[in-house]
């Protein structure tokens, strides 16, 4: 963040808040390269392109300075000389560098807001697990929840327009349009599953998508809080946004209705809660199903009117929390009653009272997880471990380290599961798959290989938390048993991994 502050202050004095000159600076691509190396994935570290080097960056910048290479051929865009043989590599480098540039205003705004609110350890708020304590606190008191699949954007210009309220640099926005229209097939961005959350896509597309989601969530939050303003900081930008929406076929008033106070009363619900991650969100309420249906059809109409996104009401499912479970962030969560018996005595009479309380139950999704392991060839579809043949050429230490890392990441992520038995089964599959892979490499049987190595191989699969607690407490102690049964939420999990994301 300090690097962003220094770089931007330098160019503010020279370029009048223009961001686009930064794309010609080498340190921008160095920042993008460092971010790529620091990505955390489950199976393998897929960082920035290994072919990237300082020489390639210098060559890329020199070609961008030559305007002839930046001209667009409308009739034959495949013959663009700018990319030439290294089209994919240069395209990746430009998009990641441009993403770093566009993120600068957002990063500076975040830093200033944290200083104003004096927020301590703000990185803890970024953890995925921080959502589940919110679930435990709020959801037992609610009755209905809607599973909302956010539709993918299909109109490029609307996405660019949503950025211009934060990036006040027309040249950067024009460069963004040029880059997206010329060097990317926009249809790949709106293809579900394989596009916007895939590893092959760039950080720039995620930034655009998050801006699109933030745009509609700002109005959703406005209706929820019944405030007198949107999230914008100036009324001039608010009027500019309204005029932009009025240029579209459907004006704003068709969504908000003519009587604005009546519209606010229409959505009045002090107990409604909203949670989102990636393309899925949950809207929960304590009110009746009638209000949930109002929100349902409002969202469908809003997406169609403002973003030209065709969304069907069937994409939003309304369920009763006490009877249905919901799948969110890899956990299968539900609300179940927790009945405790209390003995009360009044003078000489004693009686028993049932104290019923609702509790959030977070379960480990064993069947989808076995399906995910089967896709990457750790087991078959029935859950029987098999050898990972593609890893048989690696060294023994490398094979063991890969399996241990996968098992540790799964244990770390699913530490909040209410019942750990299913998690132990997955760890058993990984252990036996590791042994079979090593036995295959050494052309031996599993039984013979285990006799040769002994129990030390299986000890590698204990997580760091399990090792510490096993040293502090005996195996039979009640403290260790409560540790294995209890839920633990960690504040260092910043992304959801491939095996966890079963969709």
UniProtKB/Swiss-Prot annotation:
Domain of life, per lineage: Eukaryota
Record localization: Plastid, Chloroplast
UniProt protein name: Maturase K
Biological process annotations from GO: mRNA processing; RNA splicing; tRNA processing
Pfam families to which the protein is assigned, alphabetical: Intron_maturas2, MatK_N
Keyword Transport recorded: no
Function: Usually encoded in the trnK tRNA gene intron. Probably assists in splicing its own and other chloroplast group II introns.
Keywords linked to the UniProt accession: Chloroplast, mRNA processing, Plastid, RNA-binding, tRNA processing
GO cellular component: chloroplast
Recorded family membership: Belongs to the intron maturase 2 family. MatK subfamily.
Gene Ontology terms, MF aspect: RNA binding
